[in-house]
Amino acid sequence: MEFRQAYYDEPLIKDIKSDTSFKLSEDVDENLLPQDMRRTDLKLPQVSEVDVVRHYTRLSQMNYTVDVGIYPLGSCTMKYNPKYADRIASFAEFRNIHPFQPESTVQGTLQIMYELQEFLKKISDMDAVTLQPMAGADGEFTGILIIKKYFEDLHEDRTEIIVPDSAHGTNPASATMGGFDVVEIPSNSEGMVDLNALKAAISKKTAALMITNPNTLGIFEQNITEIAKILHDAGALLYYDGANLNAIFGITSPGLMGFDIVHFNLHKSFATPHGGGGPGAGPVAVKSFLSDFLPVPVVGYDGKRYFLDYGKKKSIGRVSSFYGSFSILLRAWSYVIRNGDDGLKNATIRAVLNSNYLKKKVEGYYEVPYYPLKKHEFVLSTEKTGRRALDIGKYLLDFGIHSPTVYFPLIVKEAMMIEPTETVSKDDLDRYADVLISALKVPEDDLKSRPRNTAVSRIDEVKAARDLKVRW
């Protein structure tokens, strides 16, 4: 399939002038008003509907989305976003409600939020949920604040959070923002948590371990129940980063593994749109002994009506305005309703199958480090090929294929992190493998000249970072 991305020298919408626009006649002749009482024209775009449509259509043609093709950005779960969820979220009954309305007038909305809380409790095998956090990192920070408040309530001075060297970068960042010191521990030769290193790192100052399972190498932490016991025996907590939840739906759960706190990325695992800075939603679930520390309000139900419950005396308080990113919560609710238990489990099975199928297709050409069996994603290394992961990622773009995540996790040199998700076909995977393999066969100068078929070719990324010019 040939690919050439559209390119337009498109101005900002405020700079578009349209001769098809017109002004309504004035009710009062302007000449009758004193000069000092006349308003100057507002600097609003004077564009017609067709000009607006064409402007944003052209911009979309210079972009790449999951609606265009495969988007295997590792650890991001860029699955297709079903349009039925968008339609439900666009209903006027939802768009026109206001957070200040009396509870009696929004019972249906509160019911949906309550049901989503119950769905997330069941999926994670946890006991209580807040829907307030507006993103995954926001959910992490909420979890960190709960951990902090919990130990303050126990009058225990625990100041350290442990993270593996394969952790998401947001884990140490969230812990630091919460006032904790970060202790990093190495992975073992199979890419999993080194238990001896964990035991050596734990002390009376340890508050929690933050971990993703499967981890960022796509490997399931086989010793997770032992890890949980080590933490709990030391009086510490176990935190589940839900970035890779798509790999375990219906198979296992954080609660069964021994986790105390979980954050969800609804904008990933639950197929809601994300990217470009938003939108997102990062609900947090906890075991019962931590439920009093959740942000308020949560949605309650007394058997007759739904209500906003502010009755948690040990709450960390609000973590967002009002009640969360409702349009994303609504999409996630509809996704769970539509799929049910069997559908969610099937999504996981297909995601893991697609990942391992693609890995098998390319592992004779690229090194796949660490333990061989992967889950929903895997990491390649281009180091032994003599070619840079960055160059191969750019090469892929010329075939209408999005690059995987490169140079992460940091413990793999020249890393390419690939997560196909369950919503791609075998044909997509075969073509992706063919292009990955062909990237090793083209001349080096050809590889470094890519991409050539995209709207924008290579940019000077160092200069862009150092000489930042923000426009809006």
Swiss-Prot record:
GO BP field: glycine decarboxylation via glycine cleavage system
Required cofactor(s): pyridoxal 5'-phosphate
Alphabetized GO MF terms: glycine binding; glycine dehydrogenase (decarboxylating) activity; pyridoxal phosphate binding
Enzyme class: oxidoreductase
Stated role: The glycine cleavage system catalyzes the degradation of glycine. The P protein binds the alpha-amino group of glycine through its pyridoxal phosphate cofactor; CO(2) is released and the remaining methylamine moiety is then transferred to the lipoamide cofactor of the H protein.
Family: Belongs to the GcvP family. C-terminal subunit subfamily.
Protein name per the record: Probable glycine dehydrogenase (decarboxylating) subunit 2
Species the sequence originates in: Thermoplasma acidophilum (strain ATCC 25905 / DSM 1728 / JCM 9062 / NBRC 15155 / AMRC-C165)
